[in-house]
């Protein structure tokens, strides 16, 4: 598709991620570390609540299984992320061997090969972020669409991230981002997201009787 903006003489060729609803009030163009350009459109839309359901579910967040639900379903972490992670390690090792400043005050300039390798690393980081975001969006939408009430363990993620053995795994899993998605989607569609004590077996409750 194409997009016309005031500061550009020619229309911009764009790939739409979704259909825009409502009247657009502002447009923001940004560029990420992988040299990709994004256009963010702000519009106001009335979101209709979904039909009321009788089903509820309790979920626990984990690392081996990303979500463990009380109805017996387990959702594994995205495999694509692990695949990209292996590629990222190789590229980062190659990057470290290229000419660049290696400590504070080092004036060694970045070589052309270093800059090229750095862009490759940024692109893989972007692919990981895109894959993870897509996974979280789809799973959060599925849970919200299929359940009227979702009970979730109230985790102290900030405290857990201080644990060096867990910090990277928790950050990679994006627990906070997933919970945020559940919160705003529950508000949009008239669902209830209830936080319970970490000692309450939320994934062991009956999904039909609660």
Residue locations for each model-derived region?
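Short Pro/Gly-enriched beta-strand edge/turn motifs at strand-loop
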Residues: 8-14
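Positively charged, helix-rich recognition surfaces that bind polyanionic ligands
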Residues: 3-7, 18-210
């Amino acid at each position: 598709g194409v997009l016309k903006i005031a500061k550009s003489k020619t229309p911009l060729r764009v790939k739409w991620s979704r259909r825009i609803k409502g009247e657009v009030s502002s447009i923001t163009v940004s560029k990420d570390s992988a040299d990709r350009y994004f256009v963010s459109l702000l519009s106001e839309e009335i979101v209709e609540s979904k039909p009321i359901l009788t089903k509820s579910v309790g979920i626990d967040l984990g690392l081996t299984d990303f979500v463990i639900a009380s109805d017996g379903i387990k959702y594994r972490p995205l495999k694509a992320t692990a695949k990209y992670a292996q590629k990222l390690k190789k590229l980062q090792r190659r990057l470290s061997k290229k000419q660049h400043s290696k400590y504070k005050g080092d004036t060694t300039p970045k070589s052309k090969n270093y800059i090229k390798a750095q862009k490759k690393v940024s692109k893989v980081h972007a692919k990981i972020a895109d894959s993870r975001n897509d996974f979280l969006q789809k799973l959060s939408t599925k849970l919200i669409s299929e359940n009227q009430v979702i009970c979730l363990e109230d985790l102290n993620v900030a405290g857990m991230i201080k644990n060096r053995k867990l910090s990277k795994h928790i950050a990679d899993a994006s627990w906070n981002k997933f919970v945020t998605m559940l919160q705003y989607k529950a508000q949009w569609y008239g669902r209830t997201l209830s936080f319970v004590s970490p000692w309450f077996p939320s994934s062991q409750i009956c999904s039909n009787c609660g």
